[in-house]
Amino acid sequence: MPLIKSISGIRGTLENIPGESLSDYDVKQFTLAYLEEIILYESSKTILVGRDARKSGKRISNIIIDVVLNEGYNVIDLGLVTTPTIGIAVKKHKTAGAIMISASHNDEKWNALKLLNSNGEFLHPEEVQKVIKEKKRTQSNKEKPGNLSSYANALDDHINLILSQNFINKNNIASKSIAVAVDGINSVGGVAIPKFLESLGIKKIKKINCNPDGNFNHNPEPLPENITDLCSEMKRGKYQLGIVVDPDADRLVLVDERGEPFGEEYTLVAAAEYLLSKNHGASTCSNLSSTLALKNITEKYGGKYFSSAVGEINVVQVMKEK
């Protein structure tokens, strides 16, 4: 019955025991602390709320929305979105921040609150500590509650932003007649990835576990031992590429035409080499646990490589500084 508080957010199991799990009480208290410590100082008084497809997600979302509205703030409910999508949506809608409800690669017994700032970035460690420290607050219940609206096009906005990049050659991809198999772990990636592939003109898509009902048919962490269904499908020889993601689609693993997983670190290096080949001299950054192959590839194309401490926010911080 753990409740884990870290720089990546507030994560817990679902026994509804206050202080020992991600209980309704704890969700309320952490939401109040987030509003008080982070959102209070922003000019915008609107936050986004999104979730992956876990069965507990809608209930937690309703609790958060109720708290935010009763504090006099506005909510834009994005519904089912990926974690990268909600970060992009913060910038588009110019909101004070966002709460993403997802325990990432953990199983259905878990859920979590991922807290974002007005830049669409995860909170800095010291900001998270403020939220954790100040969570004991009382609901104020303003006389005039905030406004609730819904926005259903966040995934489309994300896809269109990707397609607008000058290094994406949609026509070239469509001309290849590529066949792709996708394992979406029955969460939001099962919607987002096929939609993205279709936008690239890919017509043959095999959907495995792509019904976003929250029934995870295997361990959701995309490790080789957990993605055997996709690997077996690839070995049939009908597809050139396999894609599997975790429940909030912030982790991705590729599988080759032989059914062999192409490791996450190699995916980073391959993507970086493609971008660097079109933008010589550009810089890259990864955390200290990543392969040094990225450094070698960057220097090959005349760029500078920077490293950061482990944690997405640390990588982002170095990118902004350099």
Task: Locate the predicted segments by residue.
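An N-terminal, well-structured beta->alpha segment
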Residues: 1-71, 147-179
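A structured phosphate/pyrophosphate-recognition subdomain
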Residues: 3-4, 11-12, 174-199, 288-322
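Gly/Ser/Thr-enriched, mixed-charge loops and adjacent short helices
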Residues: 13, 111-235
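N-terminal small/polar loop signature for handling phosphorylated ligands or for N-terminal nucleophile
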Residues: 36, 40, 46-110, 195-255
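Conserved beta-strand elements of the Class I
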Residues: 48, 97, 179-181, 285
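Short, surface-exposed alpha-helical segments at coil->helix boundaries
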Residues: 57-62, 128, 190-194, 295
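Proline/glycine-rich low-complexity loops and linkers
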Residues: 69, 78, 130-160, 164, ...
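Short beta-strand-to-turn element immediately C-terminal to the catalytic PLP-Schiff-base lysine
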Residues: 115-118, 253-257
